[in-house]
Amino acid sequence: GVKYKASGLLRHLPVFSKQGNALLAKDGFQRERFHYFNQGFKRLVIELELEKTTLFLVHLSLRRKVRQRQLLHLQQLVADAAKPCIVAGDFNALMGPDELKGFLEATGMNKANIDNTPTYPSWNPCRVLDFVCYSPALKLNAFTLPKVTFSDHLPLVCDFEDLSA
């Protein structure tokens, strides 16, 4: 899905009109939904419902006040989900990981990158902008940050186990 609102200027500029977010699922999925934040240039939230988990992919605003409102909206999406959740993406937490504190407390979620290892820029990481957050019904078995430069952000690779199984 395109991450910018349909009437937005960025959606029509050549560089930005080709940018998007995607989720790939090996075993298929039960449902996909596209949510849009009310504010910010980057508004798309992809929701993918798997057999036992709901996954949300996000790219939050560069502006802190807008980001905080987006996190409140995301908090509601997590609360409305019937299954344990994983929320992942570029949170643009320019003020640091503490920006997620309210979101994590309100949702009861944990973050996979507990050491706050920098993820941006990929060629010389010095900022923690990207996160994977997960419900307590999931157990994080492995977390890695491969040192690759396919993007300006390092990928976060997680292996989860469903504790309710």
List each model region and its residues:
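Active-site-proximal beta-strand/loop segments in catalytic clefts of secreted hydrolases
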Residues: 8-10, 26, 58-61, 89-91, ...
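Short, catalytically relevant binding-site loops at active-site mouths
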Residues: 11-13, 38-40, 61-64, 92-94
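A long, amphipathic alpha-helix that forms part
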Residues: 66-83
